[in-house]
């Protein structure tokens, strides 16, 4: 049926013509992505040692070495993306309901119809097993585990964190890590730099973001963000038999022990708890609700093209409905992280490398770790002591202490899905706030006391909205490290991947609006990006070549 302009809709364009326009716009967006991306090479680190490959839940021998035939079956699953083939991958422990279910190895075979294709973005290879950089990454995760119960505000004086800062700074590979906070003199300040990142605002003020400790209101219900956190001084998988059972996909011994007091997030164990119990995007929704309550989006419905006009307000575009839809849409970045995890890198989790390190130190394996880790006496003696204190008969192990019984999820480590998601969410929030408002000071900042029972006013330097959004993203990414299940490169590269994907998704959407508008905000690394409706974009005022954003490094004046 063909409709004329006399159709009942008050629309100067007949419905069939509008359908054609929508189709043409979608095709043009897809062509722009295809032509703007070009050929993207996906490169892993070339590692052939199975010790550095993901194989959790597969059968292992008594030394935790994966069965070669089972590993080949996993490779076949990944290559084919077929549910029936993946169902035939052997499991090491098949008692009862399989705990070690592989987490969505077929996800990357889906096709997205918005934003870039999964394979149209990439991340750098991870360091190889013998490298000083991997040694430093693993050492940082160990130090995070040792410091789980130190209040963040005591990082500058507590023995563990002061020692951790000095020890990490002295490792050859540490200054080369992604977004690592380190002084020009090569030292790490334990209070402002330890376990932080160089992203805008993350090194300023309290460790924990305001968006994780401020109350939020949803549907007129105000929620104080105290949680039932993990019990202090309790770690898991420090006994070798327990570790091996989990590597085989066996069931944990029981649930985690919990604290009997509700607390604000005041230390690494609390932050680990948040990132273990979250529903992957809830921190972003909480953050958005807090920012709305603070009029950080100027005020609800008055943003973007509606800021300087009086008779109209946004809702579906540049209003509450739009804000929360964009946060939900940013979840699509997760699929790109799954592509990188399964199809490209398949890197082992920290708990697996911790087992290999333990067996190497014990002389039962001969893994080629860098000496900066193998001979790190200060770190290893502390790991031995904390593990022996919890093990039967005070058995000394060098396994990585986990905050949870089950250890890592059953999918590869690199990049972190939580980080990719939160890189996307942070990008959406900063785009909606805008550059000017993003640089304003966050009002009445606070931090939890050392017991996590009350909030104390922070009297230091200005904490900006954009900085606290960035800090939220880094907190969530590094909270997964504090669980013991990720490395720094998982978090940082995941955040940057989520940012890149979301910039492109926002730009696609911007070009469809009837309202004249732009998005202008600061990227994690400090550059100001501005997106225009004609498809162009600038970095720090320089008009970038190309059709789509592929990273700051590809747009230099």
From Swiss-Prot:
Keywords, sorted A to Z: Disulfide bond, Metal-binding, Oxidoreductase, Peroxidase, Pyrrolidone carboxylic acid, Vanadium
The coenzyme or cofactor needed here is:
vanadate
Where Pyrrolidone carboxylic acid occurs, residue numbers? 1
Catalytic activity annotated for this protein?
A: RH + Br(-) + H2O2 = RBr + 2 H2O
Q: InterPro entries under this entry?
A: Br/Cl_peroxidase_C, P_Acid_Pase_2/haloperoxi_sf, V-haloperoxidase
Q: Which cysteines are joined by disulfide bonds?
A: 77-86, 441-462, 544-555
Is this entry keyworded Cell membrane?
Answer: no
Please state the Enzyme Commission number of this protein: 1.11.1.18
GO molecular function list:
bromide peroxidase activity; metal ion binding
* Region span, Disordered: 1-22
Q: Paste the cofactor note.
A: Binds 1 vanadate ion per subunit.
- Keyword S-adenosyl-L-methionine assigned to the entry: answer is no
Give the binding site residues for vanadate: 341, 349, 416-418, 480, 486
Record-linked Gene3D superfamilies:
Vanadium-containing Chloroperoxidase, domain 2
Quote the catalytic residue positions: 411, 418
PANTHER family on file: PEROXIDASE-RELATED, PHOSPHATIDIC ACID PHOSPHATASE TYPE 2_HALOPEROXIDASE DOMAIN-CONTAINING PROTEIN
- What is the purpose of this protein? Catalyzes the halogenation of organic substrates in the presence of hydrogen peroxide.
Can you tell me which family this protein belongs to? Belongs to the vanadium-dependent haloperoxidase family.
Q: Can you state the subunit structure given in the record? A: Homodimer; disulfide-linked.
Name of the protein in its database record: Vanadium-dependent bromoperoxidase
């Amino acid at each position: 049926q063909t409709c004329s302009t006399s159709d009942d809709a008050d629309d100067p364009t007949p419905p069939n013509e509008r359908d054609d326009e929508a189709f043409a716009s979608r095709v043009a967006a897809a062509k722009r992505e295809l032509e703007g991306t070009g050929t993207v090479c996906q490169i892993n680190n070339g590692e052939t040692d199975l010790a550095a490959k993901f194989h959790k839940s597969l059968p292992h021998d008594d030394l935790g070495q994966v069965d070669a035939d089972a590993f080949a079956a996993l490779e076949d699953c990944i290559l084919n993306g077929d549910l029936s083939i993946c169902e035939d991958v052997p499991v090491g422990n098949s008692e009862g309901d399989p705990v070690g279910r592989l987490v969505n190895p077929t996800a990357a075979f889906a096709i997205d119809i918005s934003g870039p294709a999964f394979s149209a973005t990439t991340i750098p290879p991870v360091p190889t097993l013998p490298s000083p950089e991997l040694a430093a990454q693993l050492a940082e995760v160990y130090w995070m585990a040792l410091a789980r119960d130190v209040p963040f505000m005591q990082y500058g004086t507590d023995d563990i964190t002061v020692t951790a800062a000095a020890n990490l700074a002295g490792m050859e590979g540490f200054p080369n890590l992604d977004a690592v906070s380190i002084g020009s003199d090569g030292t790490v300040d334990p209070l402002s730099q330890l376990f932080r990142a160089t992203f805008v605002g993350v090194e300023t003020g309290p460790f924990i973001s305001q968006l994780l400790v401020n109350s939020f209101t949803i549907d007129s219900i105000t929620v104080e963000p105290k949680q039932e956190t993990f019990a202090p001084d309790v770690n898991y998988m420090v006994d070798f038999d327990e570790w091996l059972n989990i590597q085989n996909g066996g069931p944990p011994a029981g649930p985690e022990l919990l604290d009997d007091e509700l607390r604000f997030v005041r230390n690494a164990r609390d932050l680990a708890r948040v990132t273990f119990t979250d529903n992957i995007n809830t921190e972003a929704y909480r953050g958005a609700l807090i920012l709305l309550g603070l009029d950080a989006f100027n005020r609800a419905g008055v943003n973007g093209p509606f800021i300087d006009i009086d008779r109209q307000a946004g809702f579906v575009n540049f209003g509450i409905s739009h804000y929360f839809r964009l946060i939900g849409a940013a979840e699509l970045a997760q699929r790109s992280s799954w592509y990188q995890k399964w199809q490209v890198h398949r890197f082992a989790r920290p708990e697996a490398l911790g087992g290999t390190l333990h067996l190497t130190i014990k002389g039962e394996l001969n893994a080629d770790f860098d000496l900066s880790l193998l001979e790190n006496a200060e770190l290893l003696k502390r790991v031995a002591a904390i593990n022996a204190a919890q093990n039967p008969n005070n058995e000394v192990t060098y396994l990585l202490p986990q905050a949870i019984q089950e250890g890592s999820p059953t999918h590869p480590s690199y990049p972190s899905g939580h980080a990719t998601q939160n890189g996307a969410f942070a990008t959406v929030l900063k785009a909606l706030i805008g550059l000017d408002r993003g640089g304003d000071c966050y009002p009445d900042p606070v931090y939890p006391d050392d017991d996590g029972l009350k909030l104390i006013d922070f009297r230091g330097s200005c904490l900006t909205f954009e900085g606290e959004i960035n800090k939220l993203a880094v907190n969530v990414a590094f909270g997964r490290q504090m669980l013991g299940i990720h490395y720094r490169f998982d978090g940082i590269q995941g955040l940057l991947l989520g940012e890149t994907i979301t910039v492109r998704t926002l730009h696609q959407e911007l070009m469809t609006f009837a309202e004249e508008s732009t998005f202008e905000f600061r990227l994690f690394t400090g550059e100001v990006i501005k997106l225009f409706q004609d498809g162009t974009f600038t970095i720090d005022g320089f008009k970038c070549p190309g059709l789509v954003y592929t990273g700051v490094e590809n747009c230099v004046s």
